[in-house]
A protein has these predicted regions:
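Glycine-rich, aromatic-lined ligand/substrate-binding cores of catalytic
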Residues: 178-183
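Short, flexible/disordered intra-domain loops and linkers
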Residues: 82-90
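Active-site nucleotide-donor binding segment shared across nucleotidyl transfer reactions
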Residues: 43-74, 85
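Helical scaffold of the NTase/Pol beta-like nucleotidyltransferase catalytic core
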Residues: 1-54
């Protein structure tokens, strides 16, 4: 399926309209990026946690220096500071509680995955939990101690649409481990190598 065919299917109702990025103006995307940056600052200030791009957002930034046109959400992850899964979950639900107190928690989707609002509440983002145990990296919901931590750490800073964000240390290798043929746009499938699984 080409992007034009995808757009036609959205227009005809064959594909549900989820306000995909191709429908957004540049001004809207730039406002979204400002809200993304505000969230990274909020999480750093309140929790001393760095959040970084993962999944489709990282793919778009690396492949196109843009959002993927047929995507419709933003994916961040944070790296837990804890050293076992019990503490990681305790930290996660503590994070949820504080976000709820600030009226920024939209939904707990499962252990290690939430929908969180930007501080101005104009936009909502996916926030996933990642952690490193015994030098092995895990990320909800695809990676369960299957990657070396050197693929992720140290996180690297990039500039995306005038704002600074963090990405995995070896972003292309991370994408190689995540997606089938990630350098080629695939509209029919997310193309992930691993199935979703329960990590926490």
């Amino acid at each position: 399926m080409t992007l034009d065919e995808f757009k036609q299917n959205v227009a005809s109702g064959k594909i549900k309209d989820k306000w995909y990025f191709y429908k957004r103006t540049e001004d809207n995307k730039n406002a979204l990026v400002r809200d993304m940056s505000s969230l990274t600052e909020f999480i750093k200030d309140k929790f001393n946690l760095d959040i970084y791009f993962v999944y489709g957002t990282l793919l778009g930034v690396i492949r196109e220096n843009n959002f993927i046109e047929h995507d419709n959400d933003v994916d961040f992850a944070y790296i837990s500071k804890q050293t076992n899964t019990t503490e990681i979950l305790h930290e996660f639900y503590g994070l949820c509680a504080i976000l709820k107190n600030h009226d920024l928690l939209s939904k707990i989707c499962g252990n290690g995955h939430i929908h969180v609002y930007s501080p101005n509440k104009r936009n909502k983002f996916d926030l996933w939990t990642s952690f490193i145990l015994n030098d092995k990296f895990s990320l909800v919901p695809l990676f369960d101690s299957t990657l070396n931590s050197s693929l992720i750490l140290p996180l690297k800073q990039i500039t995306f649409k005038t704002k600074n964000f963090l990405i995995p240390n070896q972003a292309e290798n991370f994408l190689n481990a995540t997606y089938l043929d990630w350098k080629i746009p695939l509209l029919e499938t997310k193309g992930t190598i691993n199935p979703w699984k329960k990590i926490l």
